[in-house]
């Protein structure tokens, strides 16, 4: 399992939200590229970037900040938020991103995921955000009647690199991840699952490591590493030690 530091972008700045609410944001850094370098220095092996403005607008909104981040680090990067078509996927991959995340578009147009996986093999991730087990879209502003597990099963055989599962009710709340829901999703599909939302301590990471055998291969952490509740370097060392046996 790897620990994946997150950078959420709003109006060009690095912020964190509570439960995905845009009016409950805290600005942590005015220079996202420098923040990305810091996470790389602390041992981050993959950087998770979210274009929050893009997620709500349905189109890219922080391109200059994203480009600056990609140029600033050598580690792989993945981006989600406002990516709704093949043209945007290609543009971001051409920018230097390692892979892109389809969220709202994946729920509304699964065929886009299939097409993208064929055009860009190994570079497409699906983000499934859920509240009480139901998929939320449009920057979490809209909860659907589709169950997360049912949506994830749609993508079996498409060639999706990973599914990022976020429990919205836990995100930014520092209350611990939803281990049971994450494990259940991982057991239901053959696609690797990355856990997100609520990670607040090294103990939370250890608890997720305990379900790695179910197919949970990574954990995204945001607020905890910005507030100091988790030191990224310590979290990385913990998971590396486990990987090395």
From Swiss-Prot:
Q: Name one GO molecular function term.
A: 1-(5-phosphoribosyl)-5-[(5-phosphoribosylamino)methylideneamino]imidazole-4-carboxamide isomerase activity
Indicate the principal place this protein occupies in or around the cell. Answer: cytoplasm
Q: Which residues form the active site?
A: 8 (proton acceptor), 129 (proton donor)
Where found in the cell? Cytoplasm
Q: Which top-rank group of organisms is this from?
A: Bacteria
The catalysed reaction is:
1-(5-phospho-beta-D-ribosyl)-5-[(5-phospho-beta-D-ribosylamino)methylideneamino]imidazole-4-carboxamide = 5-[(5-phospho-1-deoxy-D-ribulos-1-ylimino)methylamino]-1-(5-phospho-beta-D-ribosyl)imidazole-4-carboxamide
Q: What is its EC number?
A: 5.3.1.16
Q: Name one GO biological process term.
A: L-tryptophan biosynthetic process
Under the heading CDD domains, the entry gives: HisA (cd04732)
Record's GO cellular component terms = cytoplasm
Q: Which InterPro entries match?
A: Aldolase_TIM, His_biosynth, HisA_bact_arch, Isoase_HisA-like, Isoase_HisA-like_bact, RibuloseP-bd_barrel
Q: Which pathway does it serve? A: Amino-acid biosynthesis; L-histidine biosynthesis; L-histidine from 5-phospho-alpha-D-ribose 1-diphosphate: step 4/9
**Key words, A-Z:** Amino-acid biosynthesis, Cytoplasm, Histidine biosynthesis, Isomerase
Q: Which family does it belong to?
A: Belongs to the HisA/HisF family.
What is the name listed in the Swiss-Prot or TrEMBL entry for this protein?
1-(5-phosphoribosyl)-5-[(5-phosphoribosylamino)methylideneamino] imidazole-4-carboxamide isomerase
